[in-house]
UniProtKB/Swiss-Prot annotation:
Protein name: Ice-structuring protein lambda OP-3
Signal peptide boundaries: 1-22
Cross-referenced InterPro entries: AFP_Neu5c_C, AFP_Neu5c_C_sf, Antifreeze_III
Location (main, coarse): secreted
Site feature Important for ice-binding, where: Q30, N35, T39, Q65
Alphabetical UniProt keywords: Antifreeze protein, Secreted, Signal
CDD domains (alphabetical): Antifreeze_III
Keyword Secreted: yes
Record localization: Secreted
Biological function: Contributes to protect fish blood from freezing at subzero sea water temperatures. Lowers the blood freezing point. Binds to nascent ice crystals and prevents further growth.
């Protein structure tokens, strides 16, 4: 039960932190193997070039799968994530 509460708190804190960071892109914090479902632990944000998926989309990315291996430190691009689209409505 404690781990569920801590996970939820971490999710809220990360979402608030990432939503307040403008002009940042999502970056892999570890090697993400092909067909892996994304979790918050696998992603961070940075002001980086090339510009990739915006930081505010992290909540949408959770549980989406990558369609290729993503090395640690790599900017996540829209074509790397299955079913991700920049034009999709944001909740």
């Amino acid at each position: 039960m404690k781990s569920v509460i801590l996970t939820g708190l971490l999710f809220v804190l990360l979402c608030v932190d990432h939503m307040s960071s403008a002009n940042q892109s999502v970056v892999a914090t570890q090697l993400i193997p092909i067909n892996t479902a994304l979790t918050l632990v696998m992603m961070t944000t940075r002001v980086i070039y090339p510009t990739g998926i915006p930081a505010e989309d992290i909540p949408r990315l959770v549980s989406m799968q990558v369609n290729q291996a993503v090395p640690m430190g790599t900017t996540l691009m829209p074509d790397m994530v299955k079913f991700y689209c920049l034009c999709a409505p944001k909740n």
